[in-house]
Amino acid sequence: QFVHLYVKDETSGSNSFDDYGLYTQVEQLNKSALQAHGLDKNGQLYKVNYFEFQRDADVIRLADDPKYNLSKFEEKLEVKGNSDHTKLIAMLNQLNDYSVPMSSILGKYFDTENLAYWMAFQLLTGNTDTQSRNMYLYSPTNSDTFYVLDWDNDGMLMRKENQIRNISTGSSWEQGVSNYWGNVLFKRCLQTKSFRDELDKAVKREYRYMSAKRINTMVDHYESITRQYLWRTPDSMYDEVAQNYRIYKESFDKPMPFFIDAPQAADGKLKFSWDTSYDFRGEDLSYDVTVAKDYLCEDVIFSKTDLALPETVTDLPGDGQYFIRVRARNASGKTQDAFDYYMTDTGKTYGTRCFYIKSGKIVEDVNVR
């Protein structure tokens, strides 16, 4: 729904309305919205604030549990519907039990088609800030199944704007399916071939739906309303969908991202370790490690390449600030950065973790991500 907004600032004594332009009106997702769309207003509805689908048993509790803390709970999942968390906990118990096949979890607690089409849309539009937030979870009464509902798409189709603003974000492992590797639900889905097949079908179908011809037809339809407000940039954005489709296909050829552990100092040595990466085709993996005094890794003090194991050791350097960068490589030569990144004024430096050495001891950077 389009809204043409005019504002009169009475605090300044103005008698006229200023034109604030054209806006789109977005419906708030709550019980009323569920009912308006033919869904169950009495069902469970959670706004995902920051949740990687880990069990988090110290926080995700039943509402009548004496240790239940609503504020802590809503740091992860904001309760927008029924406050009975029984089936949420049952789902998380199964999802985090790796002896339970993902195929049975998808058949009971999630709708494969829903997950596949949701992820396909995020991948094609480059809406990268959806790994663990910017979505809703909905489950109707008398059903164990949870559905992911799309929410907050303000980060989509941002590649051109980021280039103009010279901001480094939405790159490296945030492109393609590797963006979802840190989330238990999505990781287990992607490790399941039947889901990957459904995802590929959904991506191809949505890609056809987002064709340049269809988008241009829609633009022509809206032109009579929005013509005077159009800028050139949105008209040139279709290429980004095509680029995101290519990135999605290529992301299965690369290793998956992983986390770098906190460095350990002992007996005059500095030990580094990290999680193992994963390759969809089962190719052999190796790791390249660089330790430097700067986040661009130009002032290098230690480096190793083609490491077969996710660890290495070097002599303990003097006090100061240091950065470790780790990349995984498969047998085909495709590389992937670690999940860790270092923030600067121009955005993210991927695959890099900052730490300090003070009096021979490791001190973590408070801004480590």
Language model region names:
Residues 274, 289, 324-326:
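An aromatic-rich alpha-helical recognition segment common to small helix-rich domains
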Residues 77-132, 138-286, 351-354, 359-368:
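Middle-to-C-terminal accessory/interaction subdomains
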Residues 331-365:
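Extracellular fibronectin type III
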Residues 316-335:
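Beta-strand-rich modules
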